[in-house]
Amino acid sequence: MTNWTLAARAEKMNPSVIREILKVTEKPGIISLAGGLPSPKTFPIESFAAAAASVLATDGASALQYAASEGYTPLREAIAAFLPWDVHPDQVLITTGSQQALDLIGKVLIDAGSRVLVETPTYLGALQAFAPMEPQVVSVASDSEGVLIDDLAAKAGSGADKARFLYVLPNFQNPTGRTMSEARREALVAQAAALNLPLVEDNPYGDLWFDQAPPKPLTARNPEGCIYMGSFSKVLAPGLRLGYVVAPRQMYPKLLQAKQAADLHTPSFNQRLVSEVIKNGFLDRHVPTIRQLYKGQCQAMMAALEQEMQGLGVTWNRPDGGMFLWLRLPEGMSALQLLPRAVERNVAFVPGAAFYADQPDDRTLRLSFVTASQGQIRTAIAALASAIREAA
């Protein structure tokens, strides 16, 4: 039997907590409030079929051929045009999903032991993407409006220990669903500039607002001090694996080189498919329908929580968009220990501890309101309340 010797970085890799929990959802009858999956109801299958036929008829050979690592030029031009600040297409790098963007950024900016700042809590996938580079991940205290500016200044470090960047999701954050306020954005950008601290802004959910668009991106306020990440996974389909990075010109070449080494380029056909649905105006018509669907789903979960959680000492936030809300259990109760009781009642969620880089809060949990039907949401919240009563 061959004796394979693993790299030290591989020894430190761990399975995704969320992916492991998603295995539970394969149990018959389970209602999953766990995954960060967009609703399949939003997948524009007929429009994709028409766009695919058009691409193959007009540009089929190129769509199926190797292509430039930067990405399909018309798609990069479209992205630059719809972003709310002055972006040149040469600053846009197409990635194989936002997850690859995180990996590329980590490879370019992180050395072993480098200090990297994140919100409290933060996106688990970012922690996993950065982990092979072996950073020192430091959590910055956060409240309902976002990162606390004083704590950012205290944890930015200096000299050789100065943080490489702060990773932040200002809009409908995963996992909490919170949105950073206008005042906090202004203060964050000003403080980051004063500290000479780069920002990595991740915005996969920004188009999924319910009644009012969120404030303008951090990157729009200081384009040279930020790397911006976007995605088509939540507004079209995650199976496309299509995201993008907008980078300052001084950063772009190294990100491009990392992309070339990683996978040469994002699938050409998928890029042309998305370019086609942008060009023909479908995306502009489609996104408002997603907003309305998710708003109704969120309202159903809010109503169910208000009805079922009375007197249980449970609190939760009220997101203005996105896919998630954040729930806090009563003092002394563990979300990790609650999960098996919930699964016994055919409901799954993600314990919040997985989203903390340090000092996890085991009283928290993430609920997704977009994939279950409104009837299933009511059933699931009632079951969750029953599990909480039993655990109390």
Task: Report the location of each language-model feature.
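PLP-dependent enzyme catalytic core of the Aspartate aminotransferase-like
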Residues: 1-2, 344, 358-392
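N-terminal small-domain helix-loop-helix segment of the aminotransferase-like
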Residues: 11-97, 104, 279-280, 348, ...
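Helix C-cap/helix->beta junction micro-motif
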Residues: 28, 133, 194-195, 345, ...
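Conserved core of the PLP fold type I
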Residues: 62-195, 200, 206-225, 294, ...
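Conserved core segment of the aminotransferase class I/II
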Residues: 227-292
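Conserved glycine-rich beta-strand-loop-beta hairpin in the small C-terminal domain of fold type I
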Residues: 275, 291-302, 314-328, 338
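Conserved C-terminal alpha-helix-loop-beta "cap" of PLP-dependent enzymes
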Residues: 327-366, 379
